[in-house]
Amino acid sequence: MLCLEKLVAVLLKTQRTSDAYKKGPWKSQRYTVSGSRVAYKRLNCDDIWARKKSRRIPMVPGGTYSPMPESQPLEDSPKALPVLGEQSNSDNDINEPVFIWGISDKAAQRKSISAGEGSFRLQQEKQQPLVHRPGRGKGRLRLPHRLPFKDRHFTCSKIIGRRFACFAQRLSYRRKQSQCDLLNESTGHLPATCSSAASKSLSWNYCSKMTQQMQNLHLSQSKKHSAPSSPNAAKRLYRNLSEKLKGSHSSFDEAYFRTRTDRLSLRKTSVNFQGNEAMFEAVEQQDLDAVQLLLYQYTPEELDLNTPNSEGLTPLDIAIMTNNVPIARILLRTGARESPHFVSLESRAMHLNTLVQEAQDRVSELSAQVENEGFTLDNTEKEKQLKAWEWRYRLYRRMKTGFEHARAPEVPANACLMVSSSTSLTVSFQEPLSVNAAVVTRYKVEWSMSKDFSPLAGEIIMDNLQTLRCTITGLTTGQQYFVQVSAYNMKGWGPAQTTTPVCASPSNWKDYDDREPRHKGQSEVLESLLQQVRALHQHYSCRESSKLQTTGRKQSVSRSLKHLFHSSNKFVKTLKRGLYIATIFYYKDNMLVTNEDQIPIVEIDDSHTSSITQDFLWFMKLSCMWEDIRWLRQSVPISMSSSTVLQTRQKMLAATAQLQNLLGTHNLGRLYYEPIKDRHGNILIVTIREVEMLYSFFNGKWMQISKLQSQRKSLSTPEEPTALDILLITIQDILSYHKRSHQRLSPGLYLGYLKLCSSVDQIKVLVTQKLPNILCHVKIRENHNISKEEWEWIQKLSGSESMESVDHNADCPMQLFFYELQMAVAALLKQINIPRHQARNFRLYTQEVLEIGHNVSFLLLLPASDDVCTAPGQNNPYTPHSGFLNLPLQMFELVHFCSYREKFISLYCRLSAVVELDSLNTQQSLREAISDSEVAAAKQRHQQVLDFIQQIDEVWREMRWIMDALQYARYKQPVSGLPITKLIDSSSEQNLKKISSTSSHIDCLPSTSPSPEMHRRKAVSESQPCSDEEGCSEVFLPTDSDYDSSDALSPRDLDLVYLSSHDIAQQALSGLSGSAPDVLQVHDMKASMGPGQDPQGPGQGPDTDHSCVEFLHSLTLTGLAPKNHAKMVAGTRPPLGFLGKRKPGKHQHYGGFSRHHRWLRMHSETQSLSLSEGVYTQHLSQACGLAEDPGEAEGPGPVVDGPRGLPLAHAASLPEERRSCLQDPRRPLQRVYVEPYSDTLAGQDPKLWTSLSPTPAGRSSLPSSTSSEMSPDPTSPVSEILSSML
């Protein structure tokens, strides 16, 4: 050991006197100082100090090593330098604080005298810091201990420690000086030392120069906070601001998107800012960008928006009197007010006249002075004043003119009165249609119990115009109130506008039958139960601990060191057939991973059962009480003889606690709605949490999600992905679900759709992916309340009362509600992809209005009783569009109540999870009880737990609205609810103009034949005899599973011409053979062909391409309907698509068509034609139609109402001799002709229907005159020919 110390001393001496130390290569050596520790890094093979262990060094007088634990390490980056005004922690500078590299509020840096080696030795003897650390290998240097040594090597060790300290001190100073030089070069600051420590290498000259620079810097900074040097500082600031805005159009955008910290720093650095004057300058200059920038960077209080200036004006006064509407509206939205001096019109007019007169007098005075004096310095200043007063004179004249030309505003528009609660009414309105050259600055709402508003019951003046909505509170329930609204501008109040309806009574739907609210007092009951359960736990835990202390013997403490060598439980890297819990912490695009770049995963159990539904539901409740995991573990006894369920719960608690300890946080986030499973037997329970910022975790780091996915993709096998692979693949969907499950609906009344499907072990609810915490819905209106009158109307309509008894006047209050319901039902059916004729058995839930929470209310739309919950293996009669999700019922209730009833669900989950665990424990105790006293105590405890469970279930049933609605919806006799057929007419769907995306149908052509029955019988007689199984069914149905046979319609009820079953089968064999999908391709331009026409046809018109592009988008050539269809109502005409695959089945006539296709509307049933061939004509939105006979061919047709026309499809009739070519299975190509409208149709009688060729034997379905007129017309070319490869 002595030899080793001598060797180290020689090496230290050599290293100190070497040229490398003098010339400075030590500057490249990296080391850090943290507190009083120095860490070294080997530079080359000659260096002996390795940066493997940090050493403590003795304190140096005037040195930089502080014993304070809060001192921060110094790095090689300028970021590690002390911040502004940071005080040195050296021990020798106790007389006066010395500040480092920055500005101090006191004195600048003072000179300090470096201490000699003698004084250092004196302090070394007084305090001996602990510098020893045990080394792991041989040859480690042992520095002096704090206690005096008794061995003979003490003197040598003391000398080594002193030399080592001096050496480290000099290195520290040189390194800090180099850091300051580097920082000064990069930032341009004055050179300054980074430490107040003094050493031999620090010269007095440099300190004197540095101190003077620091003083100058301090003085310059203190000058910035002095008083303004000129009263025109605000004008200069505005001028600079305007130049910035004019120089760059994105200046306002950049300032607008600054963070709050940047805005605060900008406010601090704005020198001599006079907010009120700057705002006045911006408004007077009509600079909208400057006004927006000032309002964003500063609050209205800082700008003194409502403080009048010396002329008695506010910024809003100038904006409205100059009729600057954009600036006035911005100021009004931020809370600006008019000047309080203008109490009347006369006072405003007199004030403006005074301002104009003063400005005019001042201009005249200055003009005379400028003309009398020559070119002097004072004259130049007066010229500037003259220009300023001339500009102000023009401003006041403009304000006076604007005031004189303005008039009082008109009545507010669209004033609507709504019943918002049983004691309040809400009035909404819009700005007047004409403000008469003056911005409206306030509104007045008045209400009275008499129609003539005499006397008034009250009024409200609205100064805050952020929202044009006013709620009148404190009203009497059931009392009728009349309300009117009037507007105000600088010319006074305008006329009042009565609301629509003119009166209303405050009420709520519960007033109809005096029902108690569903959500009342449940949270208080659960809080009381939770306190009782905790008290019971504490009582039994005290009894168990006392038994252990009195009867139990002292347990032996293991003195083995074996646990030191055992690896503690860490994160799982690979999954091996078990139950695991994974946690996803994310911030934007970053995700928390372990040090091995893995998702934090902990094993719960390696021998779990295949079904964990109940355990998962219990863990779902556990996710609402992460902070109680420790208490819950302590209250659960651990026994190897416990049941399997209890052992699984205990393992879940242990794994959760382990994950919390590894991550260093209690909150693990929310649970994903289902566990992730794979074919290897792994089950992964996932929790997700979004953090506010990138925290530093002890056992983790942050990584981009895309990078983690790419790394995992390169390592995983695509054949059999594990649950971890599935998690990474679907990570974006999981995060999207987590974000959207936290979102809430805006306040209002909604119409929801209740649809469930059941599996073997659970029931699932149909929700949207955008908002999985609520049912599929559409918004009815903004007002969430349903009044007593509206609810009474619904109840009457759900009974025997018909819609004819409802008053349909526009003034009727129920008419608006009826219209809103009608629109909401139609929109919801379209959203869930259900045609109206299939929804004829749907009805509204009339038992209650679901008051979800946060001013959100729901009415429910219920399917037919048999379709409310789809059983396993049962075909869904309708398939919704994409974007929907089947959420387990319990998970839906969790995320739903977490969003709308946070306090209740938190208490319920805590209480339910604890009581369920207690139930398992008491059952286990009851099984293990032997003596009578133990059995009695176990039964008593178990009965207490059962009582708790019963009380919790009662509270839960009161809040669980979905089960009540489900029970009501599945009740068949008697049929309850409001049928939607009283709200919307399903038979009118075919007459609508726009094509609903849910039906995808093609309108039919009326038949010219007076008897469809005769044609049908003739077609059947001409066809080959066949049975109904072979395709001679009277009504074509896609499949038996889609429609009920009882819903089949008789063709004599429909004004259609049908193809016979034989013809349909022949077409399927000829034109639609094969299973390849049909593809339409744009082909060359050709004319419409008739039997007597040239195949080339007439030449194309100039607008052919334009007309084709304009009308092709409205053609419906393929059936995009859902897979399945519900039953059809009588009187409906379901259309048929034109293209489809051949589907084999037991019915031969199904061979060429899939269930996607609807009825085919043809000119003639006896002529066979491929389904993809025909002429398609755009249907005009004006009055058009077909004549019933040739004499009426040119007459006007029936008027079709709607926003746009329907595309009408009709196939051409072909001669009999061409029918054989259609039966040729080798024919590969069919043509579709698109026929545009002629430009003369708007001004002439419509001739909309054309025939491709004359039909033989006089059986033309359309008059021949139409064909003869249209065929030679050169202005009606065929737009395009679409080729379909079949």
Curated annotation (Swiss-Prot):
Residues 1260-1277 have a biased composition (Low complexity). Residues 748-755 are annotated as: Highly conserved peptide sequence. ANK repeats lie at residues 274-303, 311-340. Changing residue 748 to A: Fails to complement ENU-induced null mutation. Disruption phenotype: ENU-induced null mutation in mice produce several neurological abnormalities, including deficits in vestibular function, fear learning and circadian behavior. Residues 411-507 form the Fibronectin type-III domain. PROSITE patterns: ANK_REP_REGION (PS50297), ANK_REPEAT (PS50088), FN3 (PS50853). One of its GO terms (biological process) is equilibrioception. Residues 999-1011 have a biased composition (Polar residues). Residues 999-1032, 1086-1106, 1187-1207, 1242-1286 are annotated as: Disordered. This is Ankyrin-repeat and fibronectin type III domain-containing 1. It comes from Mus musculus (Mouse).
